[in-house]
Amino acid sequence: MTHPIIHDLENRYTSKKYDPSKKVSQEDLAVLLEALRLSASSINSQPWKFIVIESDAAKQRMHDSFANMHQFNQPHIKACSHVILFANKLSYTRDDYDVVLSKAVADKRITEEQKEAAFASFKFVELNCDENGEHKAWTKPQAYLALGNALHTLARLNIDSTTMEGIDPELLSEIFADELKGYECHVALAIGYHHPSEDYNASLPKSRKAFEDVITIL
């Protein structure tokens, strides 16, 4: 299949080693961040925050978060261009949704008169409340929707990436306490350009299950 979307997805892969001399341009970074902002979410809740690790000081903090576990991902932090933390809200309140609906009014998606009726969608949030009054089991998957959007955007931009679930959420919440207040982070994304001779994964063929093994058409 020659469609450009398929070309993007056939060529993207998980980078295993980065070239520290190459940085993502501010123009391309702006495209990625706007794509993240435009990502889909349940009831348009947008229960997330995307924290961009760019400076050397921020990278050192991120590097230090691997002190206790998942050290195999630690080398990416200083070698890649940027790291993005995909953070999801622990609790999602009516006030949070009011911000979303007020923006929808400002954007002329709904009228002020329709706003209260639109709050009916918040019932879905209440159905996903745990015994501690938190909604993280529901907000966490929303962050992964944004992650998928980011991966395809990066493929289109010819920027390499490494999805990292091998992080330490507890230590991250301590090191980035101010930035993650009210949020948790279970996945991060390293972005940049792979090392031309030391990224073994760059030259390996793509391997996915056969179409008929994963697609059922009724």
From Swiss-Prot:
Supply the Gene3D superfamilies for this chain: NADH Oxidase (3.40.109.10)
* Top-level class of the enzyme under EC nomenclature: oxidoreductase
- Indicate what this protein is called per its UniProt record: Major NAD(P)H-flavin oxidoreductase
Residue numbers binding NAD(+) = 154-159
Among InterPro entries, the record links this protein to: NfsB-like, Nitroreductase, Nitroreductase-like
Record's PANTHER family?
Answer: NAD(P)H NITROREDUCTASE YDGI-RELATED, NADH DEHYDROGENASE_NAD(P)H NITROREDUCTASE XCC3605-RELATED
Q: What residues bind FMN, as annotated?
A: 12-16, 73, 165-166, 206-208
Query: What does the annotation say about its assembly with partners?
Result: Homodimer.
Among CDD domains, the record links this protein to:
NfsB-like (cd02149)
Presence of keyword NAD: yes
What the protein does comes down to: Involved in bioluminescence. It is a good supplier of reduced flavin mononucleotide (FMNH2) to the bioluminescence reaction. Major FMN reductase. It is capable of using both NADH and NADPH as electron donors. As electron acceptor, FMN is the most effective, FAD is considerably effective, and riboflavin is the least effective.
Name the Gene Ontology molecular function terms of this record.
Answer: oxidoreductase activity
Q: What's the family?
A: Belongs to the nitroreductase family.
Which EC number(s) does the record attach to this protein? 1.6.99.-
Q: Does the keyword NADP apply?
A: yes
Write the record's keywords in alphabetical order, separated by commas.
FAD, Flavoprotein, FMN, Luminescence, NAD, NADP, Oxidoreductase
Q: Which cofactor does it need?
A: FMN
Q: Which GO terms describe its biological process?
A: bioluminescence
Q: Taxonomy-wise, where does this protein's organism fall, top ranks first?
A: Bacteria, Pseudomonadati, Pseudomonadota, Gammaproteobacteria, Vibrionales
Kindly name one Pfam family recorded for this protein. Answer: Nitroreductase
